[in-house]
């Protein structure tokens, strides 16, 4: 007996793939910033869950912050390769379990990172195989509907050059999702399907 066909198995029917193919990506040129990538992994469900981590308090930077799996690019590595490698290192996500859809808009951080978010889909069962590593204190998987329902906090920050940038915060189940992670989530929640 074969399993019923899941329409999201066909990448052309995936609403996130369709959304991504119909938009123009913003790529930044920031030669003095350190390159990094994160994996924005959404489950293949009617109300997708997004894979996030709570960073370990033992790390030298961004202790306890909520983040997508990700990190700096190694020499010769593409953002997609880095995002998949980091997700495997941080939460043991098998790269073969990820259906890659493409890159989202580049973002930068005030501490000098130029980040490329890479959008991918995973089966809900893939979440059962994840595990916490020394870099991660906890794995969290809020649904997009849950994040859309929380009261979004909007702030503005002035950078040293005088540029004002928006800051977003998503208070979710006693956790504070903010910074670059909240910015990428904001773009997904405001512009993406659903």
UniProtKB/Swiss-Prot annotation:
Pfam families: NUDIX. Residues 33-181 form the Nudix hydrolase domain. GO terms for biological process: coenzyme A catabolic process. It is an enzyme of class 3 (hydrolase). Its cofactor is Mg(2+); Mn(2+). GO terms for molecular function: coenzyme A diphosphatase activity; magnesium ion binding. It catalyses: CoA + H2O = (R)-4'-phosphopantetheine + adenosine 3',5'-bisphosphate + 2 H(+). A motif (Nudix box) lies at residues 71-92. Keywords: Hydrolase, Magnesium, Manganese, Metal-binding. Belongs to the Nudix hydrolase family. PCD1 subfamily. PANTHER family: MITOCHONDRIAL COENZYME A DIPHOSPHATASE NUDT8, NUDIX HYDROLASE. Monomer. This is Nudix hydrolase DR_1184. It comes from Deinococcus radiodurans (strain ATCC 13939 / DSM 20539 / JCM 16871 / CCUG 27074 / LMG 4051 / NBRC 15346 / NCIMB 9279 / VKM B-1422 / R1).
């Amino acid at each position: 007996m074969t399993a019923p066909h899941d329409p999201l198995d066909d990448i052309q029917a995936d609403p996130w793939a369709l959304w991504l193919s119909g938009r123009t990506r913003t790529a930044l040129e920031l030669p003095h910033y350190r390159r990094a990538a994160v994996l924005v992994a959404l489950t293949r469900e009617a109300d997708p869950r997004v894979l996030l981590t709570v960073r370990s308090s033992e790390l030298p930077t961004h202790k306890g912050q909520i983040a997508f799996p990700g990190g700096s690019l190694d020499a010769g590595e593409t953002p997609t390769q880095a995002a998949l490698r980091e997700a495997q290192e941080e939460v043991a996500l098998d790269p073969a379990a990820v259906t890659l859809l493409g890159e989202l808009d580049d973002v930068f951080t005030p501490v000098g990172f130029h980040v490329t978010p890479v959008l991918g889909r995973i089966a809900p069962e893939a979440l059962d195989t994840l595990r916490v590593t020394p870099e991660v204190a906890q794995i969290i998987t809020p649904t997009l509907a849950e994040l859309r329902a929380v009261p979004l906090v909007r702030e503005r920050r002035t950078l040293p050059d005088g540029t004002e940038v928006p800051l977003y915060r998503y208070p979710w189940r006693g956790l504070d999702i903010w910074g670059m992670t909240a910015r990428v989530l904001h773009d997904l929640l405001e512009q993406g399907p659903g």
